[in-house]
Amino acid sequence: MSLYCRTFFRRKSFGCYRLLSTYVTKARYLFELKEDEEACRKAQKTGVFYLFHDLDPLLQASGHRYLVPRLSRAELEGLLGKFGQDSQRIEDSVLVGCSEQQEAWFALDLGLKSASSSRASLPKSEMEAELGGSFIKLRQALFQLNSVDSSLLFTAQALLRWHDGHQFCSKSGQPTQKNVAGSKRVCPSSKIIYYPQMAPVVITLVSDGARCLLARQSSFPKGLYSALAGFCDIGESVEETVHREVAEEVGLEVENIQYSASQHWPFPNSSLMIACHATVKPGHTEIQVNLKELEAAAWFSLDEVTTALRRKGSLALQPSEASPLLLPPKLAIAHHLIKKWVETRSCSSLAA
């Protein structure tokens, strides 16, 4: 009976989608592609593909912006044929989303090698010439992409990187096998199933009411300051991580921790950024910077932060000798934490 029900509802599923909201329809369609190998292979035939080479996405310059080209199945097969490869290479692709019309989106890296395949890496420069684009470091291109494209490429790169790093079973040492959608890997020997994961990271904007605390690492561009951030330790809650990280990095105790938002961040590896606001205990605002963690940390006034938010320009450009305060770009959740604090403080000032 259960087998009959599963078969019946699978046949009816596409018709039922029309009765649901667009979001629910997409979510259930993607779920089906992840669970049904046959359905996913069928979707590959009508889907589109985003190309990578050694985790660098294929991009095309358009003025000061980058466009993200995508290939149809026929175009991809034609490209592979020119480089002596057949359509089996498409099995290495991973599902990264779909359109409202249920056009499936896949990402395929033509530079990475698979432990379970003898397929070779394709020549980067020759492919760039053939495709009329360039394989560019995603972090380098970040500020020239729109938010929709950057989010999709974040997901694609993170998933491709995860598969590249989990080609062998940690228990048996044997090669693992990817399902068609790329939503998991399975070890045929140990039967262990591996799922893509993100490391939880708490990012916290600390305030004393009138000022906010920002810090920088030596690797940051000149003048750039951001909110405090750190990985969650095993066994910790989000609140415990906030308390510990602030204490470790700047020697302060915080209270009134409030969750704000979250964001997937692919650099250097996939992290789930959990954004919070917190305040220091009254009368305890003296910063003691942990130089093993940070290069500097300081309190900044509302006026200073407001001015920095209004400042235009790319972080790729070096600031002047005056080193004005630079803040994370709009794409980063730290920017939204800081902006939210400014908006809240500005409203409080007006009300007063």
From Swiss-Prot:
Its main location: mitochondrion. Belongs to the Nudix hydrolase family. Keywords: Hydrolase, Magnesium, Manganese, Metal-binding, Mitochondrion, NAD, NADP, Transit peptide. Residues 1-20 form a transit peptide. One of its GO terms (cellular component) is mitochondrion. Coiled coil: none annotated. It comes from Mus musculus. Optimum pH is 7.8-8.2. Pfam families: NUDIX, NUDIX-like, Zn_ribbon_NUD. Its EC number is 3.6.1.22. It is found in: Mitochondrion. NAD(P)H pyrophosphatase that hydrolyzes NADH into NMNH and AMP, and NADPH into NMNH and 2',5'-ADP. Has a marked preference for the reduced pyridine nucleotides. Does not show activity toward NAD-capped RNAs; the NAD-cap is an atypical cap present at the 5'-end of some RNAs. The keyword Coiled coil does not apply. PANTHER family: NAD(P)H PYROPHOSPHATASE NUDT13, MITOCHONDRIAL, NUCLEOSIDE DIPHOSPHATE-LINKED MOIETY X MOTIF 13. Gene3D superfamilies: 3.90.79.20, Nucleoside Triphosphate Pyrophosphohydrolase. A motif (Nudix box) lies at residues 216-240. Divalent metal cations. Mg(2+) or Mn(2+). Its cofactor is Mg(2+); Mn(2+). One of its GO terms (molecular function) is metal ion binding. This is NAD(P)H pyrophosphatase NUDT13, mitochondrial. The gene is Nudt13. Residues 196-323 form the Nudix hydrolase domain. InterPro entries: NADH_PPase-like_N, NudC-like_C, NUDIX_hydrolase-like_dom_sf, NUDIX_hydrolase_CS, NUDIX_hydrolase_dom, Znr_NADH_PPase. The keyword Transmembrane does not apply.
